[in-house]
Regions:
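Metalloprotease/metallohydrolase-associated module, dominated by Zn2+-dependent proteases
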Residues: 1-44, 59-98
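Active-site recognition of the HExxH zinc-binding catalytic motif
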Residues: 47-56
Length: 98
């Protein structure tokens, strides 16, 4: 599965590949590519997606800042019962995009 966020700068793309050799759950690249290990599931998946997106949106932020913000956002969204469900019903976002 590939996810494209078009209104972000740079365009953020998420791809899944095994990251065992890198000893990472996720990697953010400066060109907007995020790689996530497909073994990451559930709440940890949410945390890693948020964490890597924050790295791209705020490249000047320290690892500690990114970690703190991603954990906070994950806890809030999880408490609000955000869950990844496939297939997804596409309802437009506030800007009209899917």
């Amino acid at each position: 599965m590939k996810l494209l966020l078009r209104n972000s700068k740079p365009k953020i793309r998420i791809k899944y590949r095994k990251l065992g050799k890198e000893k990472a759950w996720g990697i953010a690249h400066s060109d907007g590519l995020i790689e996530i290990d497909p073994s990451v599931k559930s709440k940890k998946h949410l945390e890693i997606v948020i964490h890597e997106v924050l790295h791209i949106l705020f490249p000047e932020a320290s690892e500690a800042e990114i970690e703190n913000k991603s954990i906070t956002l994950t806890k809030i969204l999880w408490a609000e019962h955000y869950r990844r469900i496939e297939p997804e019903v596409h309802q437009p976002l506030q800007d009209g995009t899917k």
